[in-house]
A protein has these predicted regions:
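Short, acidic/turn-prone active-site loops that include or flank metal/cofactor-
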Residues: 59, 76-79, 140-142, 208-210, ...
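Active-site/ligand-binding-proximal alpha/beta "capping" segment
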Residues: 182-232
Length: 250
């Protein structure tokens, strides 16, 4: 595959790439996102039809790429200036953002309410992909296409597309489909999740600091709790989601 060569940090492609890595608003305005790393590139080349451009460091071997993909070679010094990684792997790439899908829920869906940490969000998406559970991102969630989120998914974001909804849309969709909405909670009236059949429900995981929003608590058909040692105050959002996801598959 023929490679173009760029040697200037002022090149429009590199300026564009740095903006994609830095700002959600720019990603959404352009309809593109960028990711960093050779392993992620392998996953994108294998699973994601929206792969558009690869920027590769001189001397770095690339995985097989689709014929339509543009390949641009840059020196190591430029790769270090563009990459957000402390030890760049030598490949950064640009993809189209996926087209928005119709907002509709089905039984056995995990709803994420205000998960703001990109690492936690990426870990949850990775686990959900492994267990084949659909995920909906509600108000206040981190960007699924933030570079940190994408890295934490380990490529899962290229295989499954999380849907975005407002809280009101999620509640309305549950009601329309006859799906029970359950909220995770640290409260005395919450039911041990092992006593519930979660496969036919939509389950809400709340933010790391505030938990499930008051709006969704008020709309929920019930509350569930992960039983744990009373000395422990709470679980990390990604850890809690992993337990809920496993229970949804049982």
């Amino acid at each position: 595959m023929k490679r173009e060569t760029v040697t200037s940090a002022r090149n429009p492609l590199l300026v564009h790439l740095k903006k994609l890595l830095a700002a959600r608003s720019y990603r959404e305005a352009c309809g593109e996102f960028a990711a960093d790393g050779t392993k992620l590139l392998e996953e994108a080349a294998k699973w994601y039809p929206g792969l558009e451009t690869v920027v590769v460091q001189t001397g770095v071997e690339l995985c097989p790429l689709p014929e339509h993909v543009r390949v641009v070679e840059i020196p190591e010094s430029l790769m270090r200036s563009v990459s957000q990684m402390e030890a760049p792997q030598g490949a950064i790439f640009i993809c189209r953002l996926p087209e928005a899908r119709p907002a509709a829920l089905r039984p056995g869906t995990l709803l994420l309410d205000g998960i703001q940490d990109p690492g936690n969000l990426g870990t949850i998406l990775r686990t959900a992909d492994a267990l084949e559970v659909p995920v909906v991102l509600l108000d206040g969630c981190a960007d699924a296409y933030n570079p940190k989120t994408v890295r934490a998914t380990m490529g899962a974001v290229f295989r499954t597309q999380p849907v975005r909804m407002t809280r009101a849309e999620a509640v309305q969709s549950c009601r329309a489909a006859g799906i029970s909405l359950l909220a995770t909670a640290m409260s005395a009236d919450a039911v041990d999740l092992r006593k519930k059949n979660l496969s036919g429900c939509a389950v809400v995981i709340g933010s790391e600091g505030r938990g499930v929003s008051a709006e969704l608590f008020a709309a929920a058909d019930g509350k569930i709790i992960i039983p744990m040692n009373p000395r422990c105050e709470s679980l990390n959002a990604a850890a809690a989601a992993t337990i809920v996801l496993w229970q949804m598959k049982c």
